[in-house]
Amino acid sequence: KGCDFMEKYRVKPLKPAANMEISVPGSKSITNRALLMAALSDGRVCLKGVLFSDDSRYFLKALEELGFKLQIDEEKKEVTVTGEGGMIPEKSGEIYVGSAGTAARFLTAMLGLSGGTYTIQASEQMKKRPMKALFQALEQLGVHFDYLENEYFLPVRTLGKEAGKNRVTLDISQTSQPLSALLMASVMCNDGISIDITSEKKQGTYIEITRKMMQTFG
């Protein structure tokens, strides 16, 4: 099933006419969102048109380290993920996200809200990138962290989650990825999550992509 969340463009016919086949590359942002949603789904999900990049490979490796069953075919650009209904097979472990911002933020939200104990390592570049908005939001939701080097930066260890906290305020002025991360990972919370966006920026293309993809996944 397709996702109607991208802008539409008018394409003029090629003159003279020619018979050809064009392969359009996938999207890093869409690929990593789809991987997270597939992992949080219940049952097998086959993703087609996957973009294999450093970011998606770090994401795939992390899912394998967390115990998810994957079938990967780079030639066909396909990945099959067996979701565990919002559960993570391994209740503790360590992953490495390299310099992948989407993997870092999406997986941090998932691991934090799971209530397990996980260590999230990253490249020196990723250790300098802003994560404070996401960490503070997760702390409001009862997630406890051990910041291994600098507060509100990777690397970090999740130390479990308090029950009963489901309201959060969030500033997305720097990046909307924390909002996308919370929206997707909210399926792990029995009562859902109530998010109050405090920044002037409240909408954006990537937020809409996340919302439309979540609708597609049901």
Task: Please annotate each region the language model reported.
Residues 5-218:
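Structural preference for solvent-exposed beta-strand-turn elements
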